[in-house]
Amino acid sequence: MEDFAVSFWIYIGVMSIFVGGAVKKFLAFNIGAMPSVVVWLGATLLVERLCALCMPAVLARLVLCVCCWLYFTWATPKPSLPVEDKAVFITGCDSGFGNATAKKLDAMGFEVFATVLNLEGEGAKHLRKVCSSRLTLLQVDITQPQQVQQALLDTKAKLGIRDLWGLVNNAGWCVNIGDAELSLMSNYRGCMEVNFFGTVTVTRTFLPLLRQSKGRIVTISSPSGEHPFPCLASYGASKAALNLFINTLRHELDPWGVKVSTILPSAYKTGQSSNAEYWEKQYKSLLQGLSPNLLEEYGEEYLLETKELFQNYAKTANEDLSPVIDTIVEALLSPQPQVRYYAGPGLILMYFICSYLPLSISDRFLQKLFVQKKVMPRALIKQQGLSPNDNNNSIKENMNDSSSNNSNFTKCID
């Protein structure tokens, strides 16, 4: 009976350690170590059984103490590296994450090289106004290799004999308001040019400096590159390609001492996402680019609903960018940065469902989470013998419901 009591309390103690560690990670919205959490749980259960079956009480207590020590060693954050004499190159600083990161790093004392598409744009003017003289603005379109090469020369000239510590790949592009079949080929090519080829160009160009400093590469990607969000085929495909490139690079640069991290944010208001004129322009461009046959099969009302859903979804996205910015800082300054960071609310539930539950559940979850379409394509209505009036009613219902539905569930794409 005494052995049973000891085993029971050992079990309770070790399980408390596991639950505490898991809750700590969940509250931090960081499930990058989700597989390690599962391993930790399995090891906990195994230790409990071994304690119950094989070990005397004294040894069982010793095992519990070792588990406690391992947990606190694992859970206690290590001190950050010093900021002094560290320079960072950031792409896509006209707005959004890039603009906010440039301001944050400059305020911390970094020397910042911030790229913008337009040196006279509002984003560049704002950075000049609020940042110190340590910040250097560079006009760079990352899809133009000549401009990227010139940015390298300008950066090296400004640094002199000093090192470049970090590269933050932030520049990205998302133009898509339709199904994969409806998306224009220019959207697919545009997303790949910026999100994949542009980022590859910048990374390869600056790698010699980063290898020399044994520095950091931090890349902003998206959960849509790992999960099939409806209506994001072109954007998601480009981010999927980017994820594989960055992961491959991480293995190859490990012998050089370069740490590579990927950040996967939830939904935030960045760029043109909350601009009604922007969505209207994309909608008209889509109508003009579709073939008459395809437009007839889907119907203009189907496209209109998709546009309205995207627009309403963007309105409810998170305006506070600090979770992503703080994660970028951690990836740059942590002695042992994580391979993947999940920045923002809602990602815990989404990744758990998509990683551990059956596809039938995860697919339905993604459909309900993102764009909840009610309007059916015209061709499907004819096949099923429904009335076209049903679509008109669905549009009205969806427009009334979409805002409340989106705000009731935290969004999980950037």
Swiss-Prot record:
Reactions the enzyme catalyzes: an 11beta-hydroxysteroid + NAD(+) = an 11-oxosteroid + NADH + H(+); cortisol + NAD(+) = cortisone + NADH + H(+); corticosterone + NAD(+) = 11-dehydrocorticosterone + NADH + H(+); 11beta,17beta-dihydroxyandrost-4-ene-3-one + NAD(+) = 17beta-hydroxyandrost-4-ene-3,11-dione + NADH + H(+)
Cross-referenced SUPFAM superfamilies: NAD(P)-binding Rossmann-fold domains
Keyword check for Transferase: no
Compartments, record wording: Membrane
Alphabetical UniProt keywords: Lipid metabolism, Membrane, Oxidoreductase, Steroid metabolism, Transmembrane, Transmembrane helix
Membrane topology reported for the UniProt record: Multi-pass membrane protein
Amino acid composition bias (Polar residues), ranges on this chain: 384-397
One Pfam family linked to the record: adh_short
Residue numbers spanned by region Disordered: 382-414
GO BP terms in the entry: cortisol metabolic process; glucocorticoid metabolic process; multicellular organismal response to stress
Tissue expression notes: Broadly expressed in peripheral (brain, gill, eye, heart, liver, head kidney, posterior kidney, and gut).
Transmembrane segments: 3-23, 26-46, 52-72, 341-361
GO molecular function, one term: 11-beta-hydroxysteroid dehydrogenase (NAD+) activity
UniProt pathway: Steroid metabolism
Gene Ontology CC annotations of this record: intracellular membrane-bounded organelle; membrane
Functional note: Catalyzes the conversion of biologically active 11beta-hydroxyglucocorticoids (11beta-hydroxysteroid) such as cortisol, to inactive 11-ketoglucocorticoids (11-oxosteroid) such as cortisone, in the presence of NAD(+). Cortisol is the primary glucocorticoid in teleosts and is released to increase glucose bioavailability in order to meet the increased energy demands in response to stress. Functions as a dehydrogenase (oxidase), thereby decreasing the concentration of active glucocorticoids, regulating the hypothalamus-pituitary-interrenal (HPI) axis function in adult fish.
Family per record: Belongs to the short-chain dehydrogenases/reductases (SDR) family.
Other noteworthy facts: As zebrafish lack the enzyme catalyzing the reverse reaction (HSD11B1), cortisone cannot be recycled, it is metabolized and excreted. To maintain glucocorticoid signaling a new cortisol molecule must be synthesized.
Protein name, per record: 11-beta-hydroxysteroid dehydrogenase type 2
Chain's gene name: hsd11b2
